[in-house]
């Protein structure tokens, strides 16, 4: 049973890493465009207080 949960945990971490690379599904708050350049790939703009990472 522990092995099953370990495999699920690994799959969850890998899928989150893929989402982060392709565009995060989570809202990332920002104040300026430079805040987004550190948190998202591709230097996206900051609009309405959130990074446009997609």
Curated annotation (Swiss-Prot):
Residues 1-23 form the signal peptide. Coiled coil: none annotated. SUPFAM superfamilies: Scorpion toxin-like. It comes from the Eukaryota. Has the structural arrangement of an alpha-helix connected to a beta-sheet by disulfide bonds (CSalpha/beta). Disulfide bonds join 30-46, 36-51, 40-53. InterPro entries: Scorpion_toxin-like_sf (IPR036574). The lineage of its organism: Eukaryota, Metazoa, Ecdysozoa, Arthropoda, Chelicerata. It comes from Mesobuthus gibbosus. One of its GO terms (molecular function) is toxin activity. Inhibits potassium channels. May be active towards small conductance calcium-activated potassium channels (KCNN, SK), and less active towards voltage-gated potassium channels (Kv/KCN). Belongs to the short scorpion toxin superfamily. Potassium channel inhibitor family. Alpha-KTx 14 subfamily. It is found in: Secreted. This is Potassium channel toxin alpha-KTx 14.5. Keywords: Calcium-activated potassium channel impairing toxin, Disulfide bond, Ion channel impairing toxin, Neurotoxin, Potassium channel impairing toxin, Secreted, Signal, Toxin, Voltage-gated potassium channel impairing toxin. GO terms for cellular component: extracellular region. The keyword DNA damage does not apply. Transmembrane segments: none annotated. The keyword Cell membrane does not apply. Expressed by the venom gland. Its main location: secreted.
């Amino acid at each position: 049973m522990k092995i099953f949960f370990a495999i699920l945990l690994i799959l969850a971490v890998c899928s989150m890493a893929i989402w982060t690379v392709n565009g995060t599904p989570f809202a990332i708050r920002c104040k300026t465009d430079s805040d987004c350049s550190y948190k998202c790939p591709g230097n996206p703009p900051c609009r309405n207080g959130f990074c446009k990472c997609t």
